[in-house]
Design a protein with these regions (language model features):
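Beta1/beta-strand and adjacent pyrophosphate-binding region of the FAD-binding site
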Residues: 1-13, 29
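Short, well-ordered alpha-helix to beta-strand connector turns
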Residues: 3, 25, 205, 223-225, ...
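Short, solvent-exposed loop/turn segments at secondary-structure junctions
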Residues: 12-13, 35-37, 99, 153, ...
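Glycine-rich FAD pyrophosphate-binding loop
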Residues: 17, 22-47
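Mid-domain catalytic core of redox enzymes
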Residues: 24, 214-333
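A conserved beta-strand/loop capping segment in the N-terminal third of enzymes
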Residues: 39-52, 59-113, 171-176
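Active-site/ligand-binding neighborhood in enzyme catalytic cores
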Residues: 85-226, 230, 237
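C-terminal catalytic lobe of FAD-dependent flavoproteins
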Residues: 313-370
Length: 370
């Protein structure tokens, strides 16, 4: 059978493109080298708890069309992301707000917190030369040392003084007692998990798992008129310009015989001597679902940053000048392709929130299918 589109990758971008193509009457085949669909938003039921296998994913957006599109395939709960950060056995609210400032300095009034931050920001004069100077110029020395430095150095595997300033464009600071991490109008998590959502997106579409496109490229390229490729763009071109760099992650998941382990969905650990960056307790994502919250067990995941090497799962692009220039070479080469569309975080070598991924997929499909 000849397909109109071969979609490489059953993650959010690939699933959305495939769904829209099928809706337009196109013949679509979706393949994925993993044994499951949904990519990194894959959720798996463990004793009644939807476990986010590749780290916490909270859907949030201000994009009305994207929100309505997502709601075609899932009913979202009202989960509000309010993470905590642990530093030297004390807990601080994220993002930085009046609860954070009270815990750190004992201040209760917004103007008191502003005065401290403004005074500490003045330590940096001129254009920040690295991540450390950038962070201090935004939030001051105290917050940087307690809540930014250790976490960032673990996440990127390098001292903050060696990291480029542009990694942190901004650090959200609120002078209210609002613990909601996101400012977006819409926020939540699918009641049935992300895997069920992607299953509905792919309903009626042929899906083949455990198929590595790069290993079977010769035969696969013959069965479709066009390819939508969501894998690493450098690997598509056999790394002809060199390998793009990534950061990887390692997850250690435990099923514990207690009803509640930490009382919150996500607690970051900013201590430099603690190897993991955060602990996720998955049942707390099930907002309003008493049957889940009251289960006599819980599932927690420790998230460890890791250096990436060939063969490892790539998670975050390393957005420095070297990799940016290298990606630009691949982007220009890809621009000359007539029958290949590159999309998603790996195909575009950029970090994408879920709503950004859906927006990119919707726009791409709309342009392609018009």
């Amino acid at each position: 059978m000849k397909y109109d589109y071969l979609v490489v990758g059953a993650g959010l971008f690939g699933a959305a493109f495939a769904q829209m193509a099928k809706e337009k009457g196109k013949r679509v085949l979706v393949i994925d080298k993993r044994s499951h669909i949904a990519g990194n938003i894959y959720t798996e039921d463990v004793g009644g708890i939807a476990v986010h296998r590749y780290g916490a994913h909270i859907f949030h957006t201000d994009d009305e069309e994207v929100w309505q599109y997502a709601n075609r395939f899932a009913t979202f709960n009202r989960f509000t992301n309010a993470p905590l950060a642990k530093y030297q056995d004390r807990l601080y609210h994220m993002p930085f707000n009046m609860n954070t400032f009270y815990a750190m300095w004992g201040v209760t009034k917004p103007n008191e917190a502003r005065e401290i931050i403004e005074r500490q920001r003045k330590e940096i004069t001129g254009e920040p030369k690295n991540l450390e100077e950038q962070a201090i110029s935004l939030v001051g020395r105290d917050i940087y040392e307690a809540l930014v430095r250790g976490y960032s150095e673990k996440q990127w595997g390098r001292p903050c003084r060696e990291l480029p300033a542009f990694i942190i464009r901004r650090l959200p600071v609120r002078f209210t007692y609002d613990n909601n991490y996101f400012n977006d109008r819409y926020q939540g998590i699918p009641d049935a998990g992300y895997t069920a959502m992607v299953e509905k997106m792919l309903d009626g579409i042929e899906v083949r798992l455990n198929v590595d496109f790069l290993q079977h490229r010769a035969e696969l390229t013959k069965i479709a008129d066009k390819i939508v490729y969501t894998g690493p763009i450098d690997q598509y071109y056999d790394q002809c310009f060199g390998a793009l760099n990534y950061r990887s992650l390692r997850f250690e998941t435990r099923d514990l015989p207690v009803q509640d382990y930490q009382g919150n969905a996500v607690i970051n650990d900013t201590n430099a001597d603690v190897p993991y960056t955060r602990v996720i307790e998955h049942k707390h994502f099930a907002y309003g679902q008493a049957d889940v919250l009251n289960l006599p067990h819980t599932v927690v995941t420790y998230e460890y940053p890791a250096d990436w090497k060939q063969g490892d799962e790539p998670y975050y692009p390393v957005n420095d000048a070297k990799n940016g220039a290298l990606y630009e070479q691949y982007r220009q080469k890809a621009a000359g392709e007539r029958n290949v569309i590159f999309g998603g975080r790996l195909g575009q070598y950029r970090y994408l929130d879920m709503d950004d991924t859906l927006r990119a997929a919707i726009d791409c499909a709309r342009k392609e299918l018009q």
